[in-house]
Design a protein with these regions (language model features):
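N-terminal "domain-start" segment that seeds a small globular fold
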Residues: 15-53
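Thiol/selenol-based redox catalytic cores and closely related redox-interacting motifs
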Residues: 119-198
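Thiol-based oxidoreductase modules, predominantly thioredoxin-like and allied folds used
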Residues: 88-103, 114-125
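A short acidic (Asp/Glu
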Residues: 105-108, 129
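Conserved helix-turn-beta segment immediately C-terminal to the redox Cys motif
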Residues: 68, 75-95
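Hydrophobic small-molecule pocket/channel-lining residues, especially in calycin-type beta-barrels
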Residues: 69-72, 82, 117, 130-134
Length: 198
């Protein structure tokens, strides 16, 4: 297939994706909110409630991050760091991990992260939201593990509700690296993210 023909075919497929995106937005607008409890996390300055993470915003994004041992989660967080100020102008944004605040501080400093972080260690937040798989679960892989994702919350009627969530992973809508690599004929070609590059 010629270059021009291939680009034309790709453009048609991308147009289909835009149509699907519009359908997703329509579904999202009709969501029935899920009430959630006011979880208490360990913040960098002490205990902090989910409701306090909103600050002066009505909307809040919480990133479910697997912690300092995950190269993939780290790359996603690096990307969020790049757009943090844009997001924070519209909604509150917080990254939650199972690490202690001291570990978070050290790791965030090493990455140059600017967004707020909380620890969900010792809480039921991650499993309640569907971002921890226990041994025996369908995708538990024989043991318990954290799962990466993002949840969107809103303050409504004096409480907190979840209005959306989705997993994070290669080729999702939230990490541009994979989409750029997909423009190469070989795609990622086995490439994986690293904590540091030579």
């Amino acid at each position: 297939m010629t270059y021009a023909d291939t680009m034309s075919a790709l453009q048609a497929k991308r147009a289909q994706l835009l149509t699907l995106h519009d359908e997703i937005r329509t579904l999202q607008q009709g969501v029935e909110p899920q009430p959630v409890e006011d979880y208490v996390f360990e913040g960098w300055d002490g205990p902090v409630k989910l409701s306090q993470l909103f600050g002066d915003k009505r909307d809040l994004f919480v990133i479910h991050n697997m912690g300092t041992t995950c190269r993939y989660c780290t790359m996603w967080a690096d990307g969020f760091n790049g757009v943090y100020e844009h997001l924070a102008d519209r909604a509150a944004f917080v990254l939650s991990t199972p690490n202690t605040p001291d570990v978070q501080k050290q790791f965030a400093r090493s990455r140059g992260w600017r967004f707020p972080m909380v620890s969900h260690a010792g809480t039921t937040f991650a499993p309640d939201m569907g971002y921890r798989l226990e041994k025996g679960d369908e995708f538990g892989e024989g043991g318990s593990r954290w799962v990466p994702g993002v949840s969107a919350f809103q303050k409504r009627d004096g409480g907190v509700v979840r209005v959306s969530d989705t997993d994070l992973g290669p080729s999702d809508d939230f990490c541009s690296v994979w989409h750029l690599l997909d423009m190469l004929p070989e795609g990622p070609a086995g490439w994986e993210p690293k904590f540091r590059y030579a």
